Amino acid sequence: MRIVFAGTPEFAVPTLRALIASGHPPCAVYTQPDRPAGRGRKIAPSPVKQLAIEHGLPVFQPASLKGPEERERLVALEPDLMVVVAYGLILPTPVLTVPRFGCVNIHASLLPRWRGAAPIQRAILAGDRETGVTLMRIEPRLDAGPMLGKRSCSIGDDDTTASLHDRLAGLGAEMLIELLPGLAADRLTGEIQDESQVTYAEKIEKSEARLDWQKDATSLSRRVRAFNPWPVAETTLEGTVLRIWSAQVLDPAPDAPPGSIIACTKNLDVACGRGALRILEVQPPGKRRMSAKDFLNAHALAGKRLGT
């Protein structure tokens, strides 16, 4: 079976690697154009491109798939199937009709819950106890195609977007390889999504990272976990931004105004609208990440408040 793979970030790498390892190396790999990355903002290839080059796979990097020349190039590849994982570009209808068995996408949620750009973060923010991956046929509407398979996993109290991202990326790769024979035989029956159960995972905005200490400790803990590794939860201490990488809920808490530092000797505990948050790892401006204990050793915080 001739497979075209389309993906860009780290989330897509396990699936491409699994296709290669299973004896189904793609006849072509599509990925987004090289872009500035890292602290130096140097132009760098995507993680998918790096893996494709390592294995000698042809790589295409169009800025868009909307032009007729891109459809013609895809037609020339004579694909049986196009596998899409976090590609980042819209596949127009003329492209969707090219592969013999269509185009499929691995989405990082149990559809129809959390269609959209940020399903992992939104699942954590909502307090979901379970998430997973869905293999679906791609249709013009966003994440709305028939579902060909699902795999689920639990969301632990300590899970961050980073940890869940890696688990789901591996789960998606395993699912695709398991379902590949059915795709090749064109015998997978798609399950129509229940539109009454749809929720949308809006793109994460950097402004969401600022913690509001009036909120309860549980919701603030979810924000810390959801925004690790980006954009990273933050607060202010005497007008200076303090990033918070890790925290845990304490309950009950002393009666103190939200944002008040209620312990600052062995632990850094902060009063919330309900309950309290124990901050475990922070990052001051221009500094590395450090444990709250190391931060406390260098700062006198008794009687101070966060968010000021």
From Swiss-Prot:
Top-level EC class: transferase
Residue sites binding (6S)-5,6,7,8-tetrahydrofolate per the record: 109-112
Domain of life: Bacteria
InterPro entries assigned to the protein according to its UniProt record, in alphabetical order: Fmt (IPR005794), Formyl_trans_C (IPR005793), Formyl_trans_C_sf (IPR037022), Formyl_transf_N (IPR002376), Formyl_transf_N_sf (IPR036477), Formyl_transferase-like_C_sf (IPR011034), Met-tRNA-FMT_C (IPR044135), Met-tRNA-FMT_N (IPR041711)
Pfam families: Formyl_trans_C (PF02911), Formyl_trans_N (PF00551)
Transferase listed as a keyword: yes
Gene Ontology molecular function: any one: methionyl-tRNA formyltransferase activity
Role description: Attaches a formyl group to the free amino group of methionyl-tRNA(fMet). The formyl group appears to play a dual role in the initiator identity of N-formylmethionyl-tRNA by promoting its recognition by IF2 and preventing the misappropriation of this tRNA by the elongation apparatus.
Similarity-based family: Belongs to the Fmt family.
Stated name of the protein: Methionyl-tRNA formyltransferase
Organism encoding this protein: Methylococcus capsulatus (strain ATCC 33009 / NCIMB 11132 / Bath)
Record gene name: fmt
